[in-house]
Design a protein with these regions (language model features):
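Rhodanese-like catalytic fold shared by cysteine-dependent sulfurtransferases
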Residues: 1-34, 42-77, 85-117
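Conserved beta/loop motifs at nucleotide-recognition and modification sites
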Residues: 37
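Short, surface-exposed ligand- or partner-binding patches at beta-edge/loop junctions that are enriched
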Residues: 80
Length: 117
């Protein structure tokens, strides 16, 4: 799995990479862990589904103001929302702006909770 992600991220991308919840869990446990960016609003982020440990809450509408700082960290970024619609939009914005190494959690927090708990 990590080899697959490394391979995908080793070449320029015009589209974000999609990762499954189980893949993301393994990625977070290994070296080179990504930055998790949760693009839901603060109420959703703190709500009943919670959020992935260590995730940064940057609502979708605020993402452009943070794009340069996120890219400057030099770590892969994984976008997360409730399902994956807003996170896919967020990833598309970042990729269009030239940010590399952007992924989307397929199924969002619903998939994360169903898979990870």
């Amino acid at each position: 799995m990590l080899a697959r992600l490394a391979r995908l991220f080793s070449r320029p991308s015009t589209a974000p990479v999609w990762v499954e919840a189980a893949e993301l869990r393994r990625w977070l446990a290994g070296e080179g862990a990504p930055v998790i960016v949760d693009v839901r609003g603060p109420d959703e982020f703190a709500g009943s589904l919670g959020h992935i440990a260590g995730a940064r809450n940057i609502p979708l509408g605020e993402l452009p103001a943070h794009a340069n700082a996120l890219a400057a960290e030099g770590r892969p970024l994984v976008m997360v929302c409730l399902t994956d619609k807003r996170s896919a939009q967020a990833a598309a914005v970042l990729v269009a702006d030239g940010t590399r190494h952007v992924a989307v959690l397929r199924g969002g927090m619903k998939a994360w909770r169903a898979t990870i708990g």
